[in-house]
Structure formats: C-alpha cells, structure tokens
Amino acid sequence: LKMNVDDRGSFTEIIRTGSAGQMSVNISKPGVTKGQHWHHTKNEKFVVVKGRGLIQLRKEGSEEILKFEVSSDKIQVVEMIPGYTHNIVNLSETDELVTLMWCNEVFDSNHPDTYFDPV
C-alpha cells in the first residue's frame, strides 16, 4: 500500500471499489489537525481505533460548530455529510490518532470535490 506521509502523519488508501467507495486509514501525529475542507457529493464516515480526538463540523454559511469527542475507548461512527466543512484534531500530546475512514466515492484527482475552508 502507498502511504502518503507528511509532517502531520500519513494517509493510506486500503480498498478502492467502483460501487462502494473507498476505505482508508489516517494517522495523525500528536496535536495535529487534519481536514479543514468540505465536499459537494462525498459522504465520509470516521471511526477512531487508536487514541483520542475531536471531530468538528460546520455547515457552509453557518457559524455553529458541531463537536464530537472520539476515542478508541468508545468506538463510534461520525458522519461527514456534503456541505459541511470538517476536521479531526489529535488531542494527545504524545500518542498518534488512528482513524479508519470510509468514503462513498473513490478519490479522483481530476475531480477531487475537496474545498478548503477551516472549521
């Protein structure tokens, strides 16, 4: 598998399908925020399997921020719906945050449907 690594951690596509989207694993270094974008059509689901984090969502055009504290101590799914900018923050100062991510569409670099906007 190809790990896309930078100073924030890594992002690795695990499974790509034509009909069921894709699964990926995201590793965030301590204190790092990832995301800060929204999609027109992509629907994503995040599941933290190691560590402790904060997922934040904000509907485009709104100032209200929805916050979800997530951790491997209580496995749950948080959904990123189209039209909501979102991020995930690693709340630990020492441990990595590992998140499984499912998206209903595979990533297409010619049509990324990813628009930067801080939560």
Predicted regions and their residues:
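A short glycine-rich, His/Asp/Glu-containing loop-to-beta-strand
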Residues: 4-36
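Double-stranded beta-helix
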Residues: 62-64, 85, 89-119
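Short acidic-glycine-tyrosine-enriched beta hairpin
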Residues: 59-83
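A short beta-loop-beta micro-motif enriched in histidine and acidic residues
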Residues: 20, 32-45, 72-74
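Short, surface-exposed charged micro-motifs
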Residues: 45, 67, 87
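Short beta-strand His + acidic residue motifs that chelate non-heme Fe in jelly-roll/DSBH
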Residues: 11, 35-37, 55-57, 78-80, ...
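Glycine- and acidic-residue-biased ligand/ion/polar-headgroup-sensing regions
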Residues: 41-60
